[in-house]
């Protein structure tokens, strides 16, 4: 009989560094809305809720630098700095708020 749990991940000992070698940008974000806004780890930050005020142009092709499956919540009136990393792979974005629907390479 095995003690393995289906789907279990057993990492090696030591620290695991996320997004190793990727360029990181820090962006200041303010929630100008009257409701909290939550943005997930792999959401195309450029297309985040319009109530979030930040320099959108520099966030094209970027996502939050946080573990997969997690999110950051922006409370109304709050201003915070977040770290972003660029997407990998084919660098295509479809859906979200339909602002790109294609290649993220400019």
From Swiss-Prot:
The listed locations are: Cytoplasm
Q: Which CDD domains does the entry link to?
A: Urease_beta (cd00407)
Q: What class of enzyme is it?
A: hydrolase
Which terms in the GO cellular component ontology are assigned?
Answer: urease complex
Q: Which reaction does it catalyse?
A: urea + 2 H2O + H(+) = hydrogencarbonate + 2 NH4(+)
Q: Which NCBIfam families match?
A: PRK13203.1, urease_beta
Q: Which pathway does UniProt place it in?
A: Nitrogen metabolism; urea degradation; CO(2) and NH(3) from urea (urease route): step 1/1
Q: How does it assemble?
A: Heterotrimer of UreA (gamma), UreB (beta) and UreC (alpha) subunits. Three heterotrimers associate to form the active enzyme.
Give the molecular function GO annotations: urease activity
Alphabetical GO biological process terms: urea catabolic process
Predominant location category:
cytoplasm
Please name the InterPro entries in this protein's record: Urease_beta-like, Urease_betasu_sf, Urease_subunit
UniProt-listed PANTHER family:
UREASE
Q: Does the keyword Plastid apply?
A: no
Which is one Pfam family of this protein? Urease_beta
What's the protein name? Urease subunit beta
Provide the family line: Belongs to the urease beta subunit family.
Q: Does the keyword Zinc apply?
A: no
Q: Which keywords, in A-to-Z order, does the entry hold?
A: Cytoplasm, Hydrolase
Identify the EC number(s): 3.5.1.5
Q: Which SUPFAM superfamilies match?
A: Urease, beta-subunit
